[in-house]
Amino acid sequence: MGRSRSRSPERRRERRRSRSASRERERRRRERSRSRERRRSRSRSPHRRRSRSPRRHRSSSISPGRLKDRRDDDKKDSKESKGAKERQIAAEDLEGKTEEEIEMMKMMGFATFDTSKGKKVDGSVNAYAINVSQKRKYRQYMNRKGGFNRPLDFIA
């Protein structure tokens, strides 16, 4: 039998190694992305959380009892600071005012007609986006498995 014209086995191995390193990397990356996809549910419907508030992750370092204490402290602090603010405004702004102005300030609850633009304001003053109209969303039924070619349904 004649001698093979292909490269020697040593060189063939070296070349295979250099190719396989990049292939191996690519294959690992694909496997990782596949395993991530498998973890997700197979449902196509958008995943909705029950509450619209952002998720809060608990840190394991604080015990539930400690968390409750901290909440109580925060509530006390906020109540005290609100009362202090009102008293502080009244004490400073009462100087140099007539009795009518003082009476009106007490009745209205604020001292001046200064703008609140660009300032942080406590309370429900910031509830400005109540009546936002959103575009209607439709659920797709056509061109999908089990859709029976029925038209798009409105999602309330």
UniProtKB/Swiss-Prot annotation:
Residues 66-98 have a biased composition (Basic and acidic residues). Pfam families: SNRNP27 (PF08648). One of its GO terms (biological process) is mRNA processing. Residues 13-59 have a biased composition (Basic residues). It comes from the Eukaryota. GO terms for cellular component: nucleus. Keywords: mRNA processing, mRNA splicing, Nucleus. Its main location: nucleus. Residues 1-98 are annotated as: Disordered. It is found in: Nucleus. Belongs to the SNUT3 family. PANTHER family: U4/U6.U5 SMALL NUCLEAR RIBONUCLEOPROTEIN 27 KDA PROTEIN (PTHR31077), U4_U6.U5 SMALL NUCLEAR RIBONUCLEOPROTEIN 27 KDA PROTEIN (PTHR31077:SF1). May play a role in mRNA splicing. Part of a tri-snRNP complex. This is U4/U6.U5 small nuclear ribonucleoprotein 27 kDa protein. It comes from Xenopus tropicalis (Western clawed frog). The gene is snrnp27.
